[in-house]
Amino acid sequence: MKKLLCAVLLSPLLYSNAVLADDAKQLRETLNGTESLKADFKQTVTDINKKVIQTGAGVFALAHPNQFYWHLTAPDESQIVADGKDLWIYNPFAEEVVIMDFAEAINASPIALLVHRDDATWSQYSVTKKQDCYEIKPKSTDAGITSVNVCFNKGTLNKFNVLDDKGNLSQFDLSNQHSINAADKALFKFVLPENVDVDDQRLKTQ
């Protein structure tokens, strides 16, 4: 913001920033009411010309703090599991598992806000409320993701979409939402399959 802008021009900008801060606060309060969630999802991916390039379905779960589960069952199976420390990406077809540092992997995406509660993570994004949805945008210009929209119905997450920097829009519609139970907690503990190649990228950053 240029120092030479007069107070008249600054006033609406300061008001706008205050509104954005309130929107972020509302989203945090809504998420604070969701300690855990498990749901089925249907995925539709469209390109920059709004042409459908992929559809899919699977199971999605999250729990505070920093636990995440993503199991795409169709059309091709893949799995992402975060236990709060490490993030595991499993491709059964390629028989490969990639292991990443959780903080490094998830912090690159606005989806991080669904499982993070700390101020440092939230300060990296701007939040704008639009009816029952919140648009989350990374402040970094090289994030790879342009925006994420998360939508709620009576306080329950029911859909979200992710727009990348190439114009591809991934839309996810959730159903059968409920809090995780004792048995569901096992979802956040990845069991390494036998006879798979392991690419441990944690070692490369140490």
From Swiss-Prot:
Primary location group: periplasm
Family of this protein: Belongs to the LolA family.
One cellular-component annotation, GO: outer membrane-bounded periplasmic space
CDD domains noted in UniProt: LolA (cd16325)
GO BP annotations, alphabetical order: lipoprotein localization to outer membrane; lipoprotein transport
PANTHER family with a match to the protein in the record: OUTER-MEMBRANE LIPOPROTEIN CARRIER PROTEIN (PTHR35869:SF1)
The protein's name in its UniProt record: Outer-membrane lipoprotein carrier protein
